[in-house]
Amino acid sequence: MEKAYKLLSVQENISHKKAKALIDSGLVSIGGQKLMVARKELPQNTRFSVQKVEKPSVIFEDENILALFKPPFIESYDLVSFFKGWALLHRLDKETSGVILLVKENSEFHLKAKKAFKDRAVKKEYLAIVQGIIEEEREINAPILTIKTTKAFSKISKKGQEAVTIITPLKIINKKTLLKVGIKTGRTHQIRVHLKHINHPIIGDTLYNNEPSSAKRLMLHAHKIALLGYEFEAIAPKEFEI
């Protein structure tokens, strides 16, 4: 028996640090199941599958705004290293894919865009695949409290901030539902927490879903966003074609 990250470092011919980072990023699986603990003791003959990370791509660019497709497993804050001179306008969770916006920092448009977010004048639409069958549109209105330590964790609490999510079923197959999701507020992990709250957690959510899954990622995609006369769409990856 040996620690997982040490075995992975030998298989991939990489450092222990790099092996740990790959496991912590959710990019390593064994027999179709995601490996969650880098120090887990495993047999010497264990074989790992390592998922490759895509690079972000440009959806649209002008003098005001840069709309990108963010692949899963890339931190939003790392995007500025790919696109110099631009600043993040908002963020997506690391495992969430989809459209994300950057602007020229402290420009007139940046100030207007920040105000649009503050005034809830930004329209966002997500796609999510959840456990179980949801047959009707519904609104989830439950306050969310976020606890921030080394990693953020949110939960439903009377002490939390207002949070409203609207879900619409698009397709049902094999006891899973593909949802269109709209949010009226923007709390940390809002969609993930609200869907867990109604007992339909997102498939592949290792933080809020305890059920084992063969999904290689969190099945949440930022599909569309509109603000200040702009509207952008990121086509959903093939894994959303259920």
Curated annotation (Swiss-Prot):
Biological process, per Gene Ontology: enzyme-directed rRNA pseudouridine synthesis
Record's protein name: Uncharacterized RNA pseudouridine synthase jhp_0890
Location of the active site: D93
Domain called S4 RNA-binding: residue spans: 2-62
The EC number(s) this enzyme carries: 5.4.99.-
Source lineage: Bacteria, Pseudomonadati, Campylobacterota, Epsilonproteobacteria, Campylobacterales
Organism of provenance: Helicobacter pylori (strain J99 / ATCC 700824) (Campylobacter pylori J99)
Xref: Pfam families: PseudoU_synth_2 (PF00849)
Signal sequence coordinates: none
